[in-house]
Amino acid sequence: AIFKSYCEIIVTHFPFDEQNCSMKLGTWTYDGSVVAINPESDQPDLSNFMESGEWVIKESRGWKHWVFYACCPTTPYLDITYHF
């Protein structure tokens, strides 16, 4: 799959600005009793990342979350959120 992420850009300190972006991957169709999301590490696989001459990824991390929504307070849903 190919995912595109858009981030809010704040250029107050241009050209020395830093941006923080997040990408959340999960399912609302199947709950945590049916779907297992187990990342191999907290570092995303950037092997297919296309570099840009305009910016660099300085740091990236991922976290697994168990989420309980108001509709179903006893049913866990899983997601992985990556921060760049």
Curated annotation (Swiss-Prot):
Gene3D superfamilies on file: Neurotransmitter-gated ion-channel ligand-binding domain
Enumerate the subcellular locations listed in this protein's record, separating them with semicolons. Postsynaptic cell membrane; Cell membrane
**InterPro entries xref list:** Neur_chan_lig-bd, Neur_chan_lig-bd_sf, Neur_channel, Neurotransmitter_ion_chnl_CS
The main location is: membrane
Q: Which UniProt keywords apply?
A: Cell membrane, Disulfide bond, Glycoprotein, Ion channel, Ion transport, Ligand-gated ion channel, Membrane, Postsynaptic cell membrane, Receptor, Synapse, Transmembrane, Transport
Record-level GO cellular component terms: postsynaptic membrane
Q: What is this protein called?
A: Acetylcholine receptor subunit alpha
